[in-house]
């Protein structure tokens, strides 16, 4: 969910090369990434690139800067390995070109209206960074911070975020974890958990930008999309949810019967006009069942498919509306409009101000848990 955010990126970043001797001879990854370009320091914390592999030859690269998925290599219908996510070649690029590419978003994914909500009678005031609202935790959200990273084995990396009380003005000392596991069935299993010492709100997600053609020069409008949802939470002109549920019956944004994305981009639809495309929270029919299909995307040229499963009540689908050709990503490729799709599993936007929606409040003694699976396959 990327918009023309006026992100004030005043991180005071200190970059310092760390030529770790044990990695001096490390080769590039299958996706062509140089791990040395991810070894540095940001605000005094070390960053690196973790590489996960399975027996099928699939490879996933993750950096602890923002908990980001940097590359995903999967086979197409002819057995050719393709990188199916957008991203950058180095930590320097992630810092100098602020974006949400591949990030583990926190504390609160999506928007909080006017950066304010009331918790136990006290008004919490957050920094705003998007049309007067707080988006993805604010201008210094976790996507711009360094997680502590530990690779447990060839297929799992475990990330930890220690977020102090007052981090981006959110209350409570929060300890959060993100566990990425590459499974033998070519799925990426993402588990989030968090605890706090003071009542707070939390809503985490992964913000990968998918292009299943393996070439971000190609638009995603011919990709066939299915979403298991009867309604969306509509937005106003500032992309803020209105608090309503909008039925998708007779709406171009209805993907209960799989169809090309282009067929959902009816510019006469007011919701599409607001976002210059789809950038909406779909209310899932899965009722928190991780075994039920939430969404599916298929690229006709490569045959690569992506299935999404989650225990969350919603999924934000974003069709790359504000990719505008001003950002150059991995391997020098320019990212133009509609060259990626995001599938962000989540609680609904602005839930702290919408008591009628599932709660995002986390209290001491409780554990926040969220689960998402990205499963890749091939359709010939």
Region annotations inferred by a language model:
Residues 1-9:
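Bacterial N-terminal signal peptides that target proteins for export
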């Amino acid at each position: 969910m990327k918009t023309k955010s006026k992100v004030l990126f005043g991180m005071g970043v200190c970059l310092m090369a760390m030529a770790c001797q044990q990695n001096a001879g490390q080769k590039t990854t299958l996706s062509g990434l140089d791990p040395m370009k991810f070894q540095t320091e940001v605000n005094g914390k070390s960053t690196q690139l973790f590489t996960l592999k399975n027996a099928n030859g699939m490879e996933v690269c993750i950096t602890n800067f923002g908990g980001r998925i940097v590359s995903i290599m999967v086979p197409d219908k002819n057995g050719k390995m393709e990188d199916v996510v957008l991203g950058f070649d180095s930590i320097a690029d992630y810092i100098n070109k602020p974006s949400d590419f591949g990030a583990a978003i926190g504390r609160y994914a999506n928007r909080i209206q006017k950066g304010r909500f009331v918790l136990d009678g006290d008004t919490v005031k957050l920094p705003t960074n998007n049309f007067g609202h707080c988006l993805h935790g604010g201008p210094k959200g976790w996507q711009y911070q360094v997680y502590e990273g530990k690779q447990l084995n060839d297929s799992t990396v475990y990330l930890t975020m220690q977020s102090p009380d007052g981090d981006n003005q959110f209350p409570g000392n929060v300890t959060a974890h993100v566990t990425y596991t590459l499974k033998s069935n070519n799925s990426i299993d993402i588990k989030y958990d968090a605890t706090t010492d003071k009542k707070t709100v939390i809503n985490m997600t992964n913000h990968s930008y998918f292009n299943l053609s393996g070439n971000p020069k190609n638009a995603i409008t011919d990709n066939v999309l299915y979403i298991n949802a009867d309604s969306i939470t509509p937005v106003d002109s500032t992309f803020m949810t209105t608090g309503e549920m909008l039925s998708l019956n007779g709406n171009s944004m209805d993907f209960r019967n799989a169809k090309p994305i282009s067929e959902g981009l009816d510019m006469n639809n007011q919701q599409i006009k607001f976002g210059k495309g789809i950038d909406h929270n779909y209310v899932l029919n899965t009722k928190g069942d991780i075994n039920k299909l939430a969404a599916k995307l298929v690229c006709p040229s490569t045959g690569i498919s992506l299935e999404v499963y989650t225990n969350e009540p919603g999924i934000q689908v974003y069709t790359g509306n504000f990719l505008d050709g001003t950002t150059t990503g991995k391997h020098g490729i320019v990212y133009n409009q509609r060259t990626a799709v995001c599938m962000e599993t989540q609680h609904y936007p602005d839930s702290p101000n919408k008591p009628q929606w599932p709660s995002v409040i986390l209290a001491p003694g409780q554990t926040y848990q969220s689960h998402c699976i990205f499963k890749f396959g091939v359709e010939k």
